[in-house]
Amino acid sequence: MPTEEHQTYRELPMLPLRGVLVFPYTVIHLDVGRKKSINAIEDAMLGSKEIFLATQKEAQTDEPDEEDIYEVGTVAEIRQILKMPGGTMRVLVEGLFRAEINAYLANDPYMKVRVEELRDKKIKSPELEALMRNLVGQFEQYVRMSKKIPPETVVSVVAIEEGGRLADVIASHLNLRINEKQRILELSDINKRLNYLCELLAKEMEVLELERKINIRVRKQMEKTQKEYYLREQIKAIQKELGEKDERSSEVEEFRERIKKANMPKDAEEKAFKELERLEKMPPMVAEAVVVRNYLDWILSLPWSLETRDRLDLKAAEAILDEDHYGLEKPKERILEYLAIRKLAKKMKGPILCLVGPPGVGKTSLGKSVGRSLGRKFIRMSLGGIRDEAEIRGHRRTYVGSMPGRILQGMKTAGSKNPVFLLDEIDKMTMDFRGDPASALLEVLDPEQNYIFSDHYLEIPFDLSKVMFITTANSVFNIPRPLLDRMEIIEITGYTEEDKVHIATDYLVPKQIKEHGLKESNITFSEGTLRRIIREYTREAGVRNLERQIASICRKVARQVVEDKDTFVHVASNSLNRFLGAGRYRYGVAESENQVGVATGLAWTESGGDILSIEVALLKGKGNLTLTGKLGEVMKESAQAALTYVRSKADELGINDEIRDKYDVHIHIPEGAIPKDGPSAGITLATALASAMSGLPVRSDVAMTGEITLRGRILPIGGVKEKILAAHRAGIAKVLLPVENKKDLAEIPAPVKRKIKLVLVSHMDEVLEETLLKLEAIQPGEDFPGVLLNPELVGENLNQDRVEPEANKDLC
């Protein structure tokens, strides 16, 4: 609002200011760089050299609008312009008087406004005089406290007689926020302006007083530190004269005694003494002294010569292994062999074993049992997800917070140089720009190198040759070949159903009853119940999920016992739905009838073996092949090879030309959501194709596995034990295997061998002889589900002579 009787307006270019406010009666430099601002300056220079200065509400706004600018500003006169590099300019302006925006007249090429002058009234009163004196006194005290304002400024301020001008000049010298300065600019009442400025000045002096006290306190602390350092040096000199030892000397002497008693190798001892000499020469407060002290602590905490005595009693060790784990004969046998050799040969390098098997078969817990059976310390290190090489070898001491790798950290924890060291999930490591931890493990797991294992932090060799390293993995395919070559692979296959029943009865059920606070008198499981849990509620090679299901039943029984509903519960097979709900898995069983175009194969998965039905249908077409069931590339190629073989043997199989050339073949493997791959279904595919194209049914009690070539040769496959166990579980009477897999039959449990007839075959002709039913065996009017026999085709088959290959079977 104007303070004069007549309102005075001016039309002026406007310069929006960012982060700065110009008061009347002040001279200030402004750096101008925005295009519109430069245009406003240039236009003002062409006229009266007056320009309106208004501050933006937000300094970050590059292109301010009307609502982004405070309405009250200062009319200033341009005194000087200096053009700077980059198209900017430095402008010297002098504030003249307050003004308020009345209207915006233009926005381009610069902002032009009509402003209303707000000149101060020239009045005098006792109250105004008192306020001015108080403000001047406060300002003088502020100048003395801040020491940032020249004393000459006080002289010029004291000479000001107008209250409004006094407030503006003093406000321009204070370090205030923009909103506080803007309020001073907007206060047209001089008394209110002086009062508000006195309040702000009082707050600023309080802040300065606090800063002064803080500075004094910091200075005293620094003086105290320097004084303490000086006194310590004096104490050292006095103690030296008296022949006494100071704290640093005592620490150094303690380290020296520990190094002598550590019984370290010569090179490690020399390194330790060298670092101790460095520590002795360093001032106590130097940061490097802490690094050296930590380094010496690490060296002295490692078990350079400490060993635990092995328990060489083979019977006791075997009893411990059998107590903790059922089955697992191969790894147990290998551990006992190691004990026997240790008993005969005192000096022997520790073995490096790799236990490979599906989840839940007891690989990790077996490592702990090995440590217990040998009487050694046990250390476990999980490698899953590790991608930094420094996790194995440590960080160099040049890095802040460096420390040894997890190998030496484990050795420190063990406190002996011959622990059982379990490297869990070695197939789950990854690599990135920080290095490859698998490559770093080569030195750890190589018996020819690990006796001089060098950690980046220690930089001295440490002997790992007496450590018994055991690694675990679910698959060897993800382990780098050089690393795999350094380990002794022991495969732990899945448990049979009989094994799982035995483990559940003797281990899992008693364990869960105890963990849930129950007693054997509260709950019992029948054998049929355990079998149904295994078949319908779990699908795994191990027993982890089986234990989980048993625990679920125990929880429900525990609740019943607490609620006094039942004090004894017998978990019967027919009551499982009440405890666990409906079965989750389809239990694979053999086909009940002989069918045309349907053959039973065997599959090997991470959860063990399973049976695999293969279905073939013929459709009129052009001889094309269609494959469904989410098959992998290898399996698709096996199907193509099987079809080629069957077509090449069309005459011998009694397949007429029309069926061979004018019918499309559709091969489907059920459970289409599950990916399937591998070459071992080759002979099963060929059998199903031969059956569909010849019209001869396939025996439903026969399962088979093997890779086929175009000439009909049968190549060996993997997972023999798991596949035969799956066939036994499904009720298969006969299994056909490649003759080259005869060596794998030694792993098959004797009870399974007695119940299944194992036939070794080397050529596809032998497979067809064992699987396809001769047409003479078909009873008149008998029908085979799945594919209807073509009467004409049957007639042709009956009239053709079949080539019967000589039997070349190896029965087991």
From Swiss-Prot:
Active-site residue list: S680, K723
Lon N-terminal domain location: 12-205
Binding site for ATP: G357, P358, P359, G360, V361, G362, K363, T364
UniProt domain Lon proteolytic: residue ranges: 593-774
Enzyme class at the top of the EC tree: hydrolase
Any GO CC annotation of this UniProt entry: cytoplasm
Single GO term (MF): serine-type endopeptidase activity
UniProt catalytic activity: Hydrolysis of proteins in presence of ATP
InterPro entries documented for this protein: AAA+_ATPase, ATPase_AAA_core, Lon_bac, Lon_bac/euk-typ, Lon_lid, Lon_proteolytic, Lon_Prtase, Lon_prtase_N
Single Gene Ontology BP annotation: protein quality control for misfolded or incompletely synthesized proteins
Regulation: induction: By heat shock.
Predominant place of localization: cytoplasm
Family classification: Belongs to the peptidase S16 family.
Assembly and interaction partners: Homohexamer. Organized in a ring with a central cavity.
Job of this protein: ATP-dependent serine protease that mediates the selective degradation of mutant and abnormal proteins as well as certain short-lived regulatory proteins. Required for cellular homeostasis and for survival from DNA damage and developmental changes induced by stress. Degrades polypeptides processively to yield small peptide fragments that are 5 to 10 amino acids long. Binds to DNA in a double-stranded, site-specific manner.
Protein name: Lon protease
